């Protein structure tokens, strides 16, 4: 049977964010650090968080149910559901299997969970696109769910937490179309961030090394993308980053996104060594080897200065979500996409090309691209992002710590009833009601 495989991409999108946050400026004062350490140094304003009433299952159920409702999806016409997450509740049972309770009598649904730090969501998306392009496709659409709850022990990393979950409707004839064959990937073994202790929600993090890995993987993935882009489309004139009208990045912090966009120039400089825009960093580019360039602050500062105006126009709109929510791990890059759709008018986005970089520690990374071919005004409207973020509850740092303590008390427990209030949850949010003596979890929906 022949199916229409034209313009494969994103047809619908929902981003779920918790309905409470803590101000990063308040955390600075509470933690006794210098003013601006989190807000300026990391580029963060607010951090979303949850207590023991929400987990990755409830996140997925909430995001998926909202996608189905807002887009009036006939679930019998969904042939794949794939999940990306690193928030693990069970070492055997997948998050995808929990979400199947929303599919009624439709049991013929391919896909499973993808796990590798923050990269799993993009890998789930790639798998879904590849499924539609393959002989296994049966003509139905796919759904990708990506979400996490990012928590850190007390210390420098704690303000880089966050939480959120995205659900994407993927299929042909989409307004957001992925460019076929244009992906560059970089993978390597590294202990930069990992979670070997299953008795804790907290990761082991080598912070400086992880940022170095992020940049090194960006260099590799972007260079590999360029090889395929040149083979398909020929060499572009000028700097390579100017091929993209906008860019989105995985956002561990918003300051890191600004540095990452500037770093694209480092790879571009190899193809355009005499470009006059590089004059201010030409000596550094010629004297630093690749490894030293990863951590050289003078080069980083110089590249950021060159790309500042480009960043403000092409990237800044997308960091609205992570600035106000924090790091959502697998959902992070998609929160940036949601923000881009919400903050830039649909008529300005139409016809524009977007570059995208996904990174997951350990490590796995890809650079890819898509084109906004159709009208995305309805998608932007249905995300309801700005309204959701503007109407959340602002809690104190002490209340934040109390919520984290509730999660600590709930971790790995059975015969457990959550203590957190459901009062602040939005209508339609799934929440945990209890865990029985066999660790089976039960949920309800906030009316």
From Swiss-Prot:
Pathway membership: Metabolic intermediate biosynthesis; (R)-mevalonate biosynthesis; (R)-mevalonate from acetyl-CoA: step 2/3
Keyword 4Fe-4S attributed: no
Its EC number(s): 2.3.3.10
Keyword Ligase: no
InterPro entries cross-referenced by the UniProt entry: HMG_CoA_synt_AS, HMG_CoA_synt_C_dom, HMG_CoA_synth_N, HMG_CoA_synthase_euk, Thiolase-like
Signal sequence extent: none
Highest taxon, organism lineage: Eukaryota
Listed GO biological process terms: acetyl-CoA metabolic process; ergosterol biosynthetic process; farnesyl diphosphate biosynthetic process, mevalonate pathway
Residues recorded as bearing Phosphothreonine in the entry: 398
Phenotype upon loss of function: Impairs growth in absence of mevalonate.
PROSITE patterns: HMG_COA_SYNTHASE
Cysteines joined through disulfide linkages: none
GO molecular function annotation: hydroxymethylglutaryl-CoA synthase activity
Enzymatic reactions: acetoacetyl-CoA + acetyl-CoA + H2O = (3S)-3-hydroxy-3-methylglutaryl-CoA + CoA + H(+)
NCBIfam families the UniProt entry points to: HMG-CoA-S_euk
PANTHER family the record matches: 3-HYDROXY-3-METHYLGLUTARYL COENZYME A SYNTHASE (PTHR43323), HYDROXYMETHYLGLUTARYL-COA SYNTHASE (PTHR43323:SF2)
Entry function: Hydroxymethylglutaryl-CoA synthase; part of the first module of ergosterol biosynthesis pathway that includes the early steps of the pathway, conserved across all eukaryotes, and which results in the formation of mevalonate from acetyl-coenzyme A (acetyl-CoA). Hcs1 condenses acetyl-CoA with acetoacetyl-CoA to form hydroxymethylglutaryl-CoA (HMG-CoA). The first module starts with the action of the cytosolic acetyl-CoA acetyltransferase eg10 that catalyzes the formation of acetoacetyl-CoA.
Family membership noted in the UniProt record: Belongs to the thiolase-like superfamily. HMG-CoA synthase family.
Name the record gives this protein: Hydroxymethylglutaryl-CoA synthase
Source organism of this protein record: Schizosaccharomyces pombe (strain 972 / ATCC 24843)
Phylogenetic classification of the source organism: Eukaryota, Fungi, Dikarya, Ascomycota, Taphrinomycotina
């Amino acid at each position: 049977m022949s199916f229409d495989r034209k313009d494969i991409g994103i047809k619908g999108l929902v981003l779920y964010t918790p309905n409470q946050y803590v101000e990063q400026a308040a955390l600075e004062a509470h933690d006794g650090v210098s003013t601006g350490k989190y807000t300026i140094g990391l580029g963060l304003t607010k951090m979303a968080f949850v207590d023991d009433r929400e987990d990755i299952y409830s996140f997925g159920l909430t995001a998926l149910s909202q996608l189905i409702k807002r887009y009036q999806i006939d679930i019998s016409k969904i042939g794949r559901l794939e999940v990306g997450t690193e928030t693990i509740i069970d070492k055997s049972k997948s998050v995808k299997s929990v979400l199947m309770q929303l599919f009624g009598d439709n049991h013929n649904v391919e896909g499973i969970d993808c796990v590798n730090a923050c990269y799993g969501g993009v890998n789930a998306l790639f798998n879904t696109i590849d499924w539609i392009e393959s002989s296994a496709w049966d003509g139905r659409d796919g759904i990708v769910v990506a979400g996490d709850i990012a928590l850190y022990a007390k210390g420098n990393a704690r303000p880089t937490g966050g939480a959120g979950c995205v659900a994407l409707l993927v299929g042909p004839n989409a307004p957001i179309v992925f460019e076929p064959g244009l992906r560059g990937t970089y993978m390597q073994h590294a202990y930069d961030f990992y979670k070997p202790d299953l008795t804790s929600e907290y990761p082991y993090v080598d912070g400086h090394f992880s940022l170095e890995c992020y940049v090194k993987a960006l260099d590799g993935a972007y260079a590999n993308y360029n090889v395929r882009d040149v083979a398909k489309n020929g060499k572009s004139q000028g700097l390579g980053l100017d091929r993209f009208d906008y860019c989105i990045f995985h956002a561990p912090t918003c300051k890191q996104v600004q540095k990452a966009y500037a770093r694209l120039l480092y790879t571009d400089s190899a193809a355009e060594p005499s470009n006059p825009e590089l004059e201010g960093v030409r000596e550094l580019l010629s004297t630093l080897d690749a490894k030293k360039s990863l951590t050289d602050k003078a080069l980083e500062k110089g590249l950021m200065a060159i790309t500042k105006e480009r960043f403000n126009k092409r990237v800044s709109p997308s960091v609205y979500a992570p600035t106000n929510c924090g790091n959502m791990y697998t959902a992070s890059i998609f929160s940036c996409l949601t923000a881009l759709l919400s903050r830039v008018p649909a008529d300005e986005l139409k016809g524009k090309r977007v570059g995208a970089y996904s990174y997951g520690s350990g490590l796995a990374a890809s650079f890819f691209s898509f084109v906004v071919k159709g009208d995305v005004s309805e998608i932007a409207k249905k995300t309801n992002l700005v309204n959701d973020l503007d109407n959340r509850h602002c809690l104190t740092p002490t209340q934040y710590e109390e919520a984290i303590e509730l999660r600590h008390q709930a971790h790995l427990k059975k015969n457990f009833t959550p203590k957190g209030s459901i009062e602040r949850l939005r209508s339609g949010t799934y929440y945990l009601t209890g865990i029985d003596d066999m660790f089976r979890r039960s949920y309800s929906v906030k009316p």
